[in-house]
Amino acid sequence: GIPCGESCVWIPCLTSAVGCSCKSKVCYRN
């Protein structure tokens, strides 16, 4: 539920390496 400061409209979340995932075109962590 914490925004990772990255969008995932065009590309996947690069922050997925630190546990972030794409939700509603924005990368979130928990």
UniProtKB/Swiss-Prot annotation:
<feature type="disulfide bond">
    <location>
        <begin position="13"/>
        <end position="27"/>
    </location>
</feature>
<dbReference type="Pfam" id="PF03784">
    <property type="entry name" value="Cyclotide"/>
</dbReference>
<feature type="cross-link" description="Cyclopeptide (Gly-Asn)">
    <location>
        <begin position="1"/>
        <end position="30"/>
    </location>
</feature>
<keyword id="KW-0960">Knottin</keyword>
<feature type="disulfide bond">
    <location>
        <begin position="4"/>
        <end position="20"/>
    </location>
</feature>
<keyword id="KW-1015">Disulfide bond</keyword>
<comment type="similarity">
    <text>Belongs to the cyclotide family. Bracelet subfamily.</text>
</comment>
<comment type="function">
    <text>Probably participates in a plant defense mechanism.</text>
</comment>
<dbReference type="InterPro" id="IPR036146">
    <property type="entry name" value="Cyclotide_sf"/>
</dbReference>
<feature type="disulfide bond">
    <location>
        <begin position="8"/>
        <end position="22"/>
    </location>
</feature>
<keyword id="KW-0611">Plant defense</keyword>
<dbReference type="InterPro" id="IPR012323">
    <property type="entry name" value="Cyclotide_bracelet_CS"/>
</dbReference>
<protein>
    <recommendedName>
        <fullName>Cycloviolacin-O9</fullName>
    </recommendedName>
</protein>
<dbReference type="GO" id="GO:0006952">
    <property type="term" value="P:defense response"/>
</dbReference>
<dbReference type="InterPro" id="IPR005535">
    <property type="entry name" value="Cyclotide"/>
</dbReference>
